[in-house]
Curated annotation (Swiss-Prot):
NCBIfam families (alphabetical): PRK00080.1, ruvB
Encoding gene per record: ruvB
Name under which the protein is recorded: Holliday junction branch migration complex subunit RuvB
Assigned keywords, A-Z: ATP-binding, Cytoplasm, DNA damage, DNA recombination, DNA repair, DNA-binding, Hydrolase, Nucleotide-binding
Species this protein is from: Shewanella baltica (strain OS185)
Localization per record: Cytoplasm
This enzyme's EC code(s): 3.6.4.-
Binding residues for ATP: R24, G65, K68, T69, T70, E131, D132, Y133, R174, Y184, R221
Binding locations of DNA: R294, R313, R318
């Protein structure tokens, strides 16, 4: 199984985009969860509107699937301006960024996803644009080349990244508003599932929404994806309504257990428990034992398991925690 095949992967899949767009909240009052972030944004947005200024540049960071793109769109809606969206890997040349910047109107939002992947040459162009609303570009080539400055309208750059530490210090320092998104609690995810079901005109009760939410790994994108699959099951196997019974059976059929684990998660945990007596075990040995690349374990499988307290990283290797043993109804040896 590869990451792109996993139902519970947080990265966006092709089928998510159009459906997620319909489910996205448009304004801050419709946005569920991230209470501290919402409270801060309300103040910053109102202050900028009162002064009739562009909002400060904003960096939104955190794990994938938590709503960074949605939040950028909400900022534009709240400010009553347009938003232009792109991503770091797409901006290969300075001219690519210059074309976007020169088409912005006063107050507009420029959203750059995966901003940590900007090339150095593009990043250099961004510095004066962010600080002074100026664009330094080279005209011509060789000895005849000359630099000209173009004035830009005040704008707001919203950068999104899953790896804030990968940003260069000069770029990170130019964001006046850093916002970290955290994994969602089950209550907030239940609210999101219920709202999405309403958009889909799907009958769901509170227990059904809760069951989907608690298996969604704290991630709205996964919750919405699971909801769509549970809807299929409810319409084919039952009367179309989603109850706790229907959600449990649908998600069990999809091999997503009570903790939101799939086959790959359980395979990793059981390898540590059964093959290495609970650990510690080195990454290379673990990769060989389950037939996966070490990068897949480190970047895809481990983060959620560590965050939830099922695995510990130690200097000697990976260790399965008491909670991991309890999940499989096993007793951890002393």
């Amino acid at each position: 199984m590869i990451e792109a095949d996993r139902l519970i992967q947080p990265q966006i899949q092709a089928q998510d985009e159009s459906i997620d767009r319909a489910m996205r909240p448009k304004m801050l009052d419709e946005y569920t969860g991230q209470d501290d972030t919402r409270a801060q944004l309300k103040v910053f947005i109102q202050a900028a509107k009162n002064r009739n200024e562009a909002l400060d540049h904003m960096l939104i960071y955190g794990p994938p699937g938590l709503g960074k793109t949605t939040l950028a769109m909400i900022v534009a809606n709240e400010m009553g301006v347009n938003i232009k969206s792109t991503s770091g890997p797409v901006l290969e040349k300075a001219g690519d960024l210059a074309a976007l910047l020169t088409n912005l109107e006063s107050g507009d939002v420029l959203f750059i996803d995966e901003i940590h992947r900007l090339s150095p040459v593009v990043e250099e162009i961004l510095y004066p644009a962010m600080e002074d609303y100026q664009l330094d570009i080279m005209i011509g080539e060789g000895p005849a080349a000359r630099s000209i400055k173009l004035d830009l309208p005040p704008f707001t750059l919203v950068g999104a990244t899953t790896r804030a530490g990968a940003l260069t210090s000069p770029l990170r320092a130019r964001f006046g508003i850093p916002l970290r998104l955290e994994f969602y609690n089950i209550k907030d995810l239940s609210t999101i599932v219920t709202r999405s079901a309403q958009v889909m005109e799907l009958d769901i009760d509170a227990e059904g929404a809760f069951e989907i939410a608690r298996r969604s790994r704290g991630t709205p994108r996964i919750a919405n994806r699971l909801l769509r699959r549970v809807r299929d099951y409810a319409q084919v196997k039952h009367d179309g309504a989603v109850t706790k019974f229907v959600a449990e059976h649908a998600l069990d059929l999809l091999d997503v257990d009570s903790e939101g684990f799939d086959y790959m998660d359980r395979k990793l945990l059981l390898a540590i428990i059964d093959k290495f007596m609970g650990g510690p075990v080195g990454l290379d040995n673990l990769a060989a034992a389950i037939g996966e690349e070490r990068e897949t374990i480190e970047d895809v499988l481990e983060p959620f398991l560590i965050q939830q307290g099922f695995i510990q990283r130690t200097p000697r290797g990976r260790i399965a925690t008491v909670r991991a043993y309890q999940h499989f109804e096993l007793i951890k040896p002393e």
